[in-house]
Amino acid sequence: MTSNRVYWIPILVFALLATNDILAFDKGHLETFKKDKICEECGLTKAKLSKMELQGSNLRGSNLFRANFYKSDLTGANLSETNLGRSNMKHTNLQGANLRGADLTRADLREAFLFEANLTGALLEDTKLIGTVLKGAVWINGQICKDGSLGKCIQ
């Protein structure tokens, strides 16, 4: 006779993963980033970085899944090869930012400013782009978004 407890183990593991409590950011990485604005390949899942001045920062290759950048200034930031899936980037200034190869799946970029940002090779599946300024941005296919690119890239 098999114990019923064996069947509960996968259910408990799934419940823990579903709450995302075990998917927290590394506090040392966060402190390093806040101090130096440089943290390549850092673990900053669910980090709260809203309303921050982060111009020219370098987060290349970092895990920023579900990070909150609401109303932050990331002008000229290096966000290449980052995981920004499900991140909150509403009203964020990403002018001239490097998002080359970034995963922006299901990210919220509504009313963000991506003027002249580089999105070459970025993943934009189910990304919210309503009201997003894309004029002059390099689109995922390498083409430049023309004047009037608001919420979508006009090539």
Regions found by a protein language model. Name each.
Residues 1-9:
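Bacterial N-terminal signal peptides that target proteins for export
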Residues 25-155:
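Tandem repeat scaffolds
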Residues 16:
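A Zn2+-metalloprotease active-site environment signal
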